[in-house]
């Protein structure tokens, strides 16, 4: 996954992958609300393995920005791009590229609530770190104003954890693993001697999804 930002993503965001791509006939559905390729039967809801499955993200972004999706499947001879102007042939490798320009230009009142470019960039990098921890088998690269900001190659889980966490964490942590009925827990915890005053490097994941939970945070804090 490669992400390119301009002015903290306010001016332009490009997210590209080398996945399976979206067939031409399905591209219009990508921007429709409540349309998704992640769910095909009701039973799929019982074991969701993807980050998104409600079909709302792209439609929501398309309603407040200029969005272009370019995609190509392995079977297709060429890529296709969809935007407000319709669907046209395009150059592109296998996978999907989503370009978002002029965020909130359709809703100026909401645009003024955006923070500075530096702050918005920091928020995006933090989100990428969370996704990277959840999917260590995926390579992530982030470029900010054409300069490399983050590069995490596909790697084993432990190496990904140490790449995202502060440098001192590797020598000041212990692996954690436990089992209970219907539950398997694993992770890494820092030693009390390396405790931080802030909880900005606490990450909790349930079935591969990042969550914020005050009960878990309180349990960890109480243990220390």
Label each PLM-derived region with a short phrase:
Residues 1-224:
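N-terminal phosphate-binding caps/lids of nucleotide- and nucleic-acid-binding domains
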């Amino acid at each position: 996954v490669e992400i390119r930002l301009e002015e903290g993503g306010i001016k332009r965001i490009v997210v590209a992958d080398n996945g399976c791509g979206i067939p031409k006939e399905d591209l219009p559905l990508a921007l429709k609300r409540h349309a998704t390729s992640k769910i095909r039967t009701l039973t799929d809801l019982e074991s969701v393995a993807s980050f998104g499955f409600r079909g709302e993200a792209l439609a929501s972004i398309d309603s407040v920005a200029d969005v272009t999706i370019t995609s190509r499947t392995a079977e297709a001879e060429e890529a296709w791009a969809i935007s407000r102007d319709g669907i046209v042939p395009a150059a592109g490798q296998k996978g999907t590229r989503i370009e978002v320009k002029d965020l909130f230009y359709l809703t100026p009142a909401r645009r003024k609530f955006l923070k500075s470019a530096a702050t918005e960039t920091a928020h995006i990098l933090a989100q990428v770190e969370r996704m990277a921890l959840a999917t260590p088998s995926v390579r992530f690269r982030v470029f900010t104003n054409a300069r490399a900001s983050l590069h995490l190659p596909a790697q084993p889980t432990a190496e990904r954890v140490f790449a995202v966490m502060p440098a001192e964490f590797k020598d000041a942590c212990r692996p954690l693993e436990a089992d209970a009925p219907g539950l398997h827990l694993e992770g890494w915890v820092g030693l009390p001697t390396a405790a931080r005053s802030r909880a900005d490097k606490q990450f909790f994941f349930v079935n591969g999804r990042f969550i914020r939970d005050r009960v878990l945070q309180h349990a960890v804090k109480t243990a220390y």
